[in-house]
Amino acid sequence: MARLAAFDMDGTLLMPDHHLGEKTLSTLARLRERDITLTFATGRHALEMQHILGAISLDAYLITGNGTRVHSLEGELLHRDDLPADVAELVLYQQWDTRASMHIFNDDGWFTGKEIPALLQAFVYSGFRYQIIDVKKMPLGSVTKICFCGDHDDLTRLQIQLHEALGERAHLCFSATDCLEVLPVGCNKGAALTVLTQHLGLSLRDCMAFGDAMNDREMLGSVGSGFIMGNAMPQLRAELPHLPVIGHCRNQAVSHYLTHWLDYPHLPYSPE
């Protein structure tokens, strides 16, 4: 029996309308009743996730910013990882050949250089939103991550540019087909989950995890039981071909699987 369950949010727990379904909320509550530790492991900001936890009245650990922050049930900061100031400066000030918009994150929030209302659709559940700033005046000492949002082919070309400029000084990953992230070296959900399990006196073998994108790769590959969403990025399936694939987030597939796991643990599972 797993002792900790870790969940990605977008494309995993959240439905395509960016809400948590009632079946999902009910199943999460059942896990807590079984004394299974809940952990939300997401690229979203800690401020937003703390608001969501309050709204759904669930106790859960938080891995946010794709592993840049880990918080306890009480909101205590257990782990932090920031981009080196020189890396943040290079990414912010360089003229990249891209049409993608740039977004900067630190403990105070989400910052960008211009209004992009379409991006706020993903945050209707929480009301979290960006702050408009002059990117060139952004303090460099506390940047957790930098994201680029745009067309996937354009971002793929940008990834090559970033890698050539940064080398091994940053970790690049796609958190969605339309979002490329620049993270501290060694920073990912799997590394953050390792920190958390050590804090809790657990091993990664005691954990199950669910995800759909390349920012979930290390987490899914390191736990005792990793599950890939039916709507996952093809690259993730290719990287972890041995992991089982469950259903689509629109059908609350995590809830569907966990209900079977709780009620019929000895019977084979079918996502249909």
UniProtKB/Swiss-Prot annotation:
Keywords: Hydrolase, Magnesium, Metal-binding. GO terms for molecular function: 4-amino-5-hydroxymethyl-2-methylpyrimidine diphosphatase activity; magnesium ion binding; phosphatase activity. The keyword Kinase does not apply. It holds the Pfam family Hydrolase_3. Mg(2+) binds at residues 8, 10, 212. SUPFAM superfamilies: HAD-like. InterPro entries: Cof, HAD-like_sf, HAD-SF_hydro_IIB, HAD_sf, HMP-PP_phosphatase. The active site is at 8 (nucleophile). Its cofactor is Mg(2+). It catalyses: 4-amino-2-methyl-5-(diphosphooxymethyl)pyrimidine + H2O = 4-amino-2-methyl-5-(phosphooxymethyl)pyrimidine + phosphate + H(+). Its EC number is 3.6.1.-. Coiled coil: none annotated. The keyword DNA damage does not apply. Belongs to the HAD-like hydrolase superfamily. Cof family. Catalyzes the hydrolysis of 4-amino-2-methyl-5-hydroxymethylpyrimidine pyrophosphate (HMP-PP) to 4-amino-2-methyl-5-hydroxymethylpyrimidine phosphate (HMP-P). This is HMP-PP phosphatase. The gene is cof.
